[in-house]
């Protein structure tokens, strides 16, 4: 088997820092990569958090960790059991001093399942901290398990008005073979920026069925769904799609 034309690229729709590990893995497999952040992170004001009021903390992203670590003392965050979505997020949390509980979760949904198994049955709530829009909202699952929750928004995403020149050029020249999309929100924002570029030959590797549905509603022809956020899962799907 051979790879597609070496001039084609995989486009990762994510901030540069978070996208680099996947880029490095793909480059080692002779795949060209371009990273295209399509929004910026804007912290929002939130009231001081008394972590003693909660039995556990659920963190959805590295951005959440950075904001909490900046606005909360290390002593405070060490006292509450913390569950993170993904190993990369957990790595950042441990470095920042959070008291992370080890899990085998590979998605927001599987993490919610593990939290439900591990927490105690008491009157304290689960604190969910993250962005204004969550790729997966665990609150209904917790409610079904009779677990109370509190959600605090610490940042929002400001959409970019245009794609970068390099990204636009690759799309215009039909030199993008794969696009990596991590959330329904990212899919929606990207489709707004896509304009009249041809996508029929672009394979979208996306996280979750909600993201897939958004793409299919907008007539995206080639969509692969990844059910967890592990690097190797995304990389393997892209490598396979790049082979003929």
Protein language model annotation of sequence segments:
Residues 1-244:
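Signature of uroporphyrinogen-III synthase
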